[in-house]
Amino acid sequence: MFVFISFSVSYADEVNDLLNFYVNKFKPEKALLVISDKPDKTGKFNDVYMELTGVVIEKLRLDSLVVRMRGVQFNEPKEWKQGNVKCSEALSVLATSTILEKDINKSIADRTFGKGDGEWHDLMLRIKPEGLSGSGYYKFSILDIRIDIDSKLKVVKGKELWLDEPFVRVNKLDIPDYVTNKALSRIQPLVDLRKLPLPLTLHKVELKNGSATLSSRKLPEALTKGLKYTYTK
């Protein structure tokens, strides 16, 4: 359900089309879009704030995604109604996203679990303030290898979360390093936001019990004045 909260303006339908695109793209449970003023005819906004809950990116659920963009250029508004929305650039983009441990585990299971050679099963990762730990089984030839992992985490290329200097233990001492390296490569990156259609770059990760938060160097602040659009699933 969409709700437009503002005074009556002729371009409300255009911005509703914009929100509709992100709702269809991300399948959020809730969404809030706030704009400082109307877009110009080229699709440029002065200031945009977006707050999404329960976003799905490539089958990975993000518990939250918050973005503040200034001087942001979209394609022409007349194209938005057809679901053609492109965000090409912005003068400033601040963002933060929190991903829950259970959603990372589900995403990895969907991507890597199986019974064949080179596949994982029963892998469970745990996130704590000091880092990540976990264990699972990796199929290599006729072997079913138990692998234990302890690792820090790092942001890579502005949109990915990777293991950082992982320490690995296996239940068979004669397993060569290339096997464990291959096993780890199957679950990397843990989080991949490259398909996120926004020009954002994340720089840091903060870990809490059961969650990881990726953020830009500065956190986005809410846009308190402007035209507000909301969506609830």
Each language-model region and where it sits:
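Bacterial N-terminal signal peptides
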Residues: 1-6
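Extracellular/lumenal and peripheral-membrane lipid-interaction modules
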Residues: 10-233
